[in-house]
Amino acid sequence: MRNSSKTMVLCSLFAALIAICAWISIPVGDISFTLQTLGIFLSLGLLGGKRGCAAIAIYLLLGAAGMPVFSGFRGGLGMLIGVTGGFLWGFLLCGLTYWALERFGKLPAMIAGQLICYLCGCIWFYLYADGGLWVILLRCVVPFLIPDAAKLYLAYILTRRLSRHIT
């Protein structure tokens, strides 16, 4: 398979993986707990920053076009501009952060990407919700810290074990 064909197939498959991970969802207030970030970090860790960002962009474009790829089998532009849209945009910024920092190691790049995703999501959520910084952090970050750390570490471990089989 030609390299460009292989890249297109891998990016598309990982965009699908992110969607499947998004469908595994448990509502927690305004924000659902999903395995989306596991899919994001597997994409970045296994494909690298550039191709991982492409997979994330494909995922977001499919959702924007109305495909039900987001949590709760939802899609459409409304999801990208809704109350949790900042987290969706944060996935792309997370990918770009990973891409910029991957030369320092996968785990530090993943952690930095997760922090950027939180930042983007919290700023966006603040524009929609009442309350100050602490209220936003209690709603958008605190309940997700431990599960997100576990997903990030699982993605890191899987990336280390599977990398030689993907690229």
Regions found by a protein language model. Give the residues of each.
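Hydrophobic transmembrane alpha-helices
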Residues: 1-53, 94-99, 159-163
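Short helix-perturbing small/polar motifs within transmembrane alpha-helices
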Residues: 9-15, 20, 77-119
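Structural signal for membrane-spanning alpha-helices in multi-pass inner-membrane proteins
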Residues: 18, 22, 44, 63, ...
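Interfacial aromatic-anchored transmembrane helix boundaries in multi-pass membrane proteins
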Residues: 22-35, 60-94
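Membrane-helix interface "capping/anchor" motifs
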Residues: 44-56, 101-108
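Residue-level recognition of membrane-helix boundary sites in multi-pass small-molecule transporters
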Residues: 50-51, 85, 135
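Membrane-embedded alpha-helical hairpins and interfacial helices in multi-pass inner-membrane proteins
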Residues: 73, 103-167
